[in-house]
Amino acid sequence: MKVGEQIILAARKQAEGQLEVHKANIEVYRTMPAGIGEHSDVTEAVIAELDKMSSAYDRIEMIEKFFSKNDN
């Protein structure tokens, strides 16, 4: 694998990892909202996590669109 391909793969893996972290955080809010002391507004906290998920997902889509191995 070429260095450029490794960089793109690393960027994709980082975005995938961030996506999973934020999904897990939302699951914590969904299953234990009373147990999150520093977040009195769970809805706002979930919206913030969704925004972070959106950013990571957008990066994955950009990588697929512009740096896919299936480019013609």
What function would you assign to each model-found segment?
Residues 2-72:
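Extended, charge-rich alpha-helical interface modules
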